[in-house]
Design a protein with these regions (language model features):
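Flavin (FAD/FMN)-binding glycine-rich loop and adjacent Rossmann-like elements that form
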Residues: 6, 13-37, 41-378, 383-416
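N-terminal cofactor/phosphate-binding cores enriched in small/glycine residues
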Residues: 1
Length: 418
């Protein structure tokens, strides 16, 4: 195992084309940080990947018969779940209803103050996504280009605001490890050497997605969703207001053994296996003694490519049961998260509560939500402080160390029991 001694940071800036570049101007533009313990809570898994990575990309660990031919075998390059670019709208009708997706004869409300915190949220659009001709035409046209509208979830931009942030646009074929600023210069060795030829960098995908959001086709199509009839995309300086970053859903996964990396290893080469989520309450009990918390979310696999939205020729949502028809997706059941999921066998002093955590790809479809990442983050923060205070590397924790960390978490209000 290797040992991280320092990380080097540099400012970034977005250029006029929308591409994020290194910003080396000024005496304070670069910073070197030394430390005893390092934590990678990133989406890209950059520190994990650059230090000493023994894991896999995307869904590489799936059964080979659930992968495309170019994802299989030792030279296979696996796909990553679709990304999204959030955008802002105004003109939402919060009284909108829609046919219930489980029974079209019934109606359901789309918007409400669901947390009673003064901020409204909304989710819906499955019926329109499946049946509305304008939405279908948009997806048929833009899907092959790597973009598609999906049923939405959205939130008001603060109490009483007329503006909303919307998660509705899928962006396919994005390599969450790949950034334009690593194409040249001092960091060119950091660009992934195994990027798929049909994939885009995060930066190029962000720029293209913003262009799609700025199109009249997009504006007309979103108005077909319930509550969106009079909605318009909010603009600033002539361009749509969008998220500063792409919402990535998957990048890399830390494995237990680098030599065992292969297709069909989702139940053997990860601290948290697929079955720990598929059969929670049984197989995950082996992790009870070293648990750091609970993962509580359903297995929510988004599309890996546009074709996943139309498994049998018609648009479907959600797509989990189609892309993984070989397994039975359970109802929500909490899963014990072991300490080994955030430690890595390849670096003595690195903790990974971010996307690169030691979870098989199918399990990551449940672990990828922010509340579950907060559970990992709480554990990593406590473990890092404990390691520094006790002068021990996180990878070398014994059972007494694990128990001590569990007690700190419990005393802080963390849930460690089902």
């Amino acid at each position: 195992s290797s040992h991280i001694t320092e990380v080097r940071l540099c400012h970034i800036k977005r250029d006029d084309e929308g591409i994020v570049q290194w910003d080396t101007e000024g005496s304070d533009s670069k910073l070197t940080i030394t430390g005893d313990v390092f934590i990678d809570a990133s989406e890209s898994g950059r520190l994990t990947r650059l230090s000493n990575f023994g894991g896999t990309v995307g869904r590489y660990d799936w059964p080979a018969n659930k992968l495309d031919s170019d994802e299989r075998g030792s030279s296979g390059k696996a796909r990553q779940q679709a990304a999204s670019l959030m955008f802002k709208v105004t003109g939402i009708d919060t009284s909108a209803t829609e046919p219930d997706p489980k029974n079209n004869a019934l109606t359901r409300t789309v918007f409400g103050d669901k947390d009673s915190n003064g901020v409204w949220s909304g989710d819906g659009g499955i019926y329109a996504y499946k049946n509305n001709s304008k939405i279908i035409n948009f997806n048929n046209t833009y899907g092959p280009r790597g973009f598609a509208l999906k049923p939405f979830n959205m939130a008001q931009d603060g109490p009483g605001s007329g503006e909303w942030w919307v998660n509705m646009l899928l962006v396919f074929n994005v390599d969450g490890r790949a950034y334009n600023r690593d194409l040249t210069g001092d960091t060119k060795n950091h660009f992934p050497k195994d990027m798929r030829s049909d994939y885009k960098t995060v930066d190029d995908a962000w720029v293209k997605a913003r262009e799609v959001i700025d199109s009249s086709d997009f504006q007309e199509a979103i108005q077909e969703f319930p509550g969106f009839r009079n909605a318009t995309v909010v603009k600033e300086n002539g361009m749509p207001v969008v998220g500063n970053t792409l919402y990535l859903r998957e990048t890399i996964h830390s494995a237990l053994s680098s030599s065992a990396r292969a297709n069909d290893t989702e139940n053997s080469n990860y601290a948290l296996r697929a079955t720990d989520f598929l059969e929670a309450g049984t197989t995950d009990n082996r992790n009870y003694a070293k648990r750091m918390g609970l993962n509580a979310y359903w297995i929510d696999v988004n599309a890996y490519k546009f074709e996943d939205l139309k498994p049998n020729g018609a648009y479907e949502w959600p797509v989990t049961k189609f892309v993984r028809s070989d397994v039975t997706i359970p109802d929500l059941s909490p899963t014990y998260v072991p300490y080994s999921a955030i430690a890595t066998n390849f670096v003595l002093n690195l903790l990974i509560p971010g996307y690169a955590t030691g979870v098989a790809s199918l399990g990551w479809a449940a672990a990828r939500t922010i509340p579950n990442q907060c559970v990992l983050g709480d554990a990593a923060g406590v473990a890092a402080a404990y390691a520094a205070n006790n002068n021990v590397d996180p990878l070398n924790f014994g059972s007494a160390d694990i128990t001590a960390i569990q007690n700190i978490l419990k005393n802080s209000g963390a849930l460690l029991e089902k």
